[in-house]
Regions:
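Alpha-helical solenoid scaffolds
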Residues: 1-290
Length: 290
């Protein structure tokens, strides 16, 4: 299978019909790769299918493959499929020209995993109601996967998913604040997310920083408190608590009343000192002018 697709990559698209009449039908070869979970090789057949079988068939195959790659956490490959699907949804009126022009580049990505330059995502440009049914299918698959990861607090996978597919996490968080992104209980969330992220590794800390930045951009307090605590970002917590003393009081009581959070008592003491200092400075600045 790899040999056939490698030959196709080096062959002018005008000769693909002859090549696959001898090697076998492209859809059948795609299906065999798909069933064997050779997803990267299967992806290389999609542009061949677009040219030989038509855009509708190739889009159907790409959507199936997108779902499968997400299920296997193959997020770089999923990102390439997303870009193909969005492009094909716009440009298949010129299918033959586009297939010949894009096939070496697209197949090169899939065969050799070469790095790509990040561009602004097409997923950010329109609201759901403005998108075509074809693009809606892509969006629905991506959002369903994001909800699956968020609900299970699989946060490192969520970060990899967002980076690989350029999924619009900010828009998703704004929409799902009371849905799949909601944290029901601070104590259980802090314990579970701490276990999931394993904060003693550099990559997990980088993932947490990535998520914290997004949560701050949408002012998602519950998540900010959890992630800033795990990262011991005292300055973030002080900035939040000095504007919300009720939240500070609840936070302090929770950390002190659960033995599992004893590791954060030093952070709590530092926060108390800093907030007291902030309060004193505020009183001085608001005091009577002599």
């Amino acid at each position: 299978m790899d040999v056939v697709v490698s030959v196709a990559r080096k062959t002018d698209g005008r000769h693909w019909a002859d090549l696959f009449s001898a090697a076998g039908r492209s859809t059948e070869m795609f299906e065999e790769c798909f069933q064997r979970r050779w997803y990267r090789t299967a992806a290389c057949y999609i542009l061949v299918i677009a040219k030989l079988e038509g855009p509708a068939v190739s889009q159907y195959c790409a959507l199936r493959l997108l779902q499968a790659t997400l299920d296997e956490s193959l997020y770089e490959l999923a990102g390439e499929l997303v870009r193909f699907l969005l492009r094909s949804g716009r440009d298949f009126e010129n299918a033959n020209t586009d297939s010949e022009k894009l096939s070496p580049r697209f197949m090169g990505y899939l065969l050799f995993r070469s790095p790509y330059k990040r561009q602004s995502s097409d997923l950010k440009s329109n609201s759901m109601k403005e998108l075509s049914p074809h693009i809606n299918s892509v969006m629905n698959i991506l959002e369903s996967h994001a909800s699956y990861l968020m609900s299970g607090k699989e946060l490192s996978k969520l970060v990899a998913f967002v980076k690989g597919t350029q999924f619009d996490l900010v828009e998703y968080l704004q929409r799902e604040r009371q849905g799949s992104a909601r944290l029901e209980n601070f104590a259980s969330a802090l314990e579970l997310i701490g276990e999931k992220l394993q904060m003693d590794t550099l990559q997990s800390r980088l993932d947490a920083e990535f998520l914290l930045a997004h949560m701050c951009s949408v002012k998602f307090k519950e998540w900010i408190v959890v992630l800033a605590t795990l990262l011991r970002r005292a300055e973030v917590l002080v900035d939040l608590f000095r504007h919300d003393l009720r939240l500070w009081k609840a936070y302090s009581i929770t950390l002190q009343s659960h033995d599992v959070f004893s590791e954060y008592l030093d952070l709590l003491s530092a926060l108390e000192e800093e907030l007291s200092s902030v309060s004193d400075r505020t009183l001085q600045s608001n005091g009577p002018v002599s």
